[in-house]
Amino acid sequence: MMDWFMSTVYFYGPEINVSNRVVRNFSSDIENFLRISFVDEDCEKLRATDLSPRSASGHDANRTALYKRVLSVLSDGITIGGKNFEFLAFSSSQLRDNSAWMFASRQGLAASDIRTWMGDFRNIRNVAKYAARLGQSFSSSTETLKVQKYEVEEISDIKNGTQHVFSDGIGKISSAFANEVAMKCNLKRFAPSAFQIRYGGYKGVVAVDPTSRWKLSLRKSMLKFQSDNITVDVLAYSKYQPGFLNRQLITLLSTLGVRDSVFEQKQEEAVNQLNKMVTDPQAAIEAIELMPMGEITNAVKELLLCGYQPDDEPYLSMLLQTFRASKLLELKTKSRILIPKGRAMMGCLDETRTLKYGQVFIRATSGVNDNDRFTVTGKVVIAKNPCLHPGDIRILHAVDVPVLHHMFNCVVFPQQGPRPHPNECSGSDLDGDIYFVSWDPSLIPPRMVTPMDYTPAPTETLDHDVTIEEVEEYFTNYIVNESLGMIANAHVVFADKEDLKAESSPCIELAKLFSIAVDFPKTGVPALIPPELHVKEYPDFMEKLDKVTYESKGVIGKLYREIKKHTPHIKHFTREVARRSYDTDMIVDGYEDYITEAMALKDEYDFKLGNLMDHYGIKSEAEIISGCILKMAKNFTKKSDADAIRLAVRSLRKEARSRFSEMSLDDNGHGHDASEAKASAWYHVTYHPEFWGCYNEGYERPHFISFPWCIYEKLLRIKQRRKFVRKMQPELFSLHNLRI
């Protein structure tokens, strides 16, 4: 990976990343792949004005030297260590981040050969769409199973006599095959109701159909290009996801009549829960459902169930305090308020044709335990982020449909009516979009307005095959014309200042421009912001310290100033904390025999963990371990790099467990069962005051304590046995007295 600055190039070593179809297939050439990002001198995304003045009319004469430099890097490639890396392609998320894949051609394999392997794109005569289809194979995914073409059913799209495609982006999967795919995704407890997939040139969602005998049933709206690839790659799947409000949702709901006091109460309830979780075990267990799911979540839950108090054990305490701090930060910067009677759900289609227009089916789980299911009935509010137009908020009626009970943790829309409900929500479809759904009566607005028309602008069709040079130029022009952030920020400001809020004329115009900007990667048609919609002063909650600001009188301003009163508090593992918290229950006979090895392994673990933290610019051990990152280096983002960080930490912990298993084996690979003594040694060299600070000499790093919890099952087994012995001692003593 490398960052290309205006005047400098920074190189980064290999990173653990979520894989994609292309890299998996050409894994033997992994050293020939390169990710390049174009950033400014502050490691932030290039702005449109860096490449073209705001007054530019689109002619080459108005492009800056930087524009030509970016284009030349893409067209001429970049040479590193004797290898010339040439442009390959970019995914949709990479395009938004001004990033792309490059490849160093070798004898027998060039970048053009990889693109040919990906599929046949010759019938696509629009540059933006062509680039998007190239990027389809670079979506981060999990490889599952191969499906032969004869095992795939082609089914018709559903238009219902309208110009709209109600089934846009969605097909079906049999129950049996869904179970097989779930196993390949390491989902042993349950099979999801829907998977977001890539299969050959198909993209979209497949939802479980218990009546189907075909492995896959796919529609024309899902086919984007021809490809010989027959592997099902999974990008995401339906699952329990808590529902959160954000500034856009709050703005629209407020515009439609939801009172400010409702949002203030919801925020207060969320803060109270966060405050309780750092002292109350039950509140902490409930809050765990909101943490990024994974091995760390399980460890935290097991620690609590074992009887550890949230504010007592340092490792547990720092994870919970960091989680609280990250949620407070989200409340302050995004107004991200938890809604218990709400979920974030993947959209699906009612294949039974039971639901009427205005109805939805919602069957949810109470938490990650998928067996605890319930069906929602009554009025619900539904939206899809991002949402700027008041008509993006839909009030629908949730009904119970027994024949759809197999569909859970997803929102099922009808295939009937004048227009698909997903399209009414920000112009969405069913190819993997996630919808905010709430059945909280206090959040149901008293009125609903007509949704906006999201028909995309007509696209330019070329009279020739798209060339890779045109794709490179399109990438550079995207940086010039990318205006989503500017439009969204302007909408926030005008909605805050105008009496009609999001229904004001400036906001309606900005919503239309935003729709054009969202479609730009597919259409190539830019959104041009008129001068009167440029922002001159910002509300205080946007924290634009270098701009003219004012105190917001709106609901977002009220929420912001209230949440500023709450400050995060994360305790550090000082020598005094080590003296106070060292748990003698963890001492097991024979642990001394493994001290030397344990110290060496902890030293190695801490060194690698510290390097990861330095690489990503993460300040605390708890942040990188929990995934609740408060701040990181400017050249990384929580949204784009969270998976890479999670995988890197998981790999480090897995390596530590592997080294634990190898400890003290003889030359033949045999060893006696002394796992508890080894685990005790790991705990001792981490927690005992004698060892405090001895691993970070020469480094400006605090004392790390996550090392022994890589084997938390072993430590908890020791703790549970000690608790059991203490519990039994009075009974044994009484029995002894009776015998006397």
UniProtKB/Swiss-Prot annotation:
Keywords: Nucleotidyltransferase, RNA-binding, RNA-directed RNA polymerase, RNA-mediated gene silencing, Transferase. One of its GO terms (biological process) is positive regulation of post-transcriptional gene silencing. Its EC number is 2.7.7.48. The keyword Lipid biosynthesis does not apply. Pfam families: RdRP (PF05183). It is an enzyme of class 2 (transferase). One of its GO terms (molecular function) is RNA binding. GO terms for cellular component: nuclear RNA-directed RNA polymerase complex. It comes from the Eukaryota. It catalyses: RNA(n) + a ribonucleoside 5'-triphosphate = RNA(n+1) + diphosphate. Probably involved in the RNA silencing pathway and required for the generation of small interfering RNAs (siRNAs). Belongs to the RdRP family. This is Probable RNA-dependent RNA polymerase 1. It comes from Oryza sativa subsp. japonica.
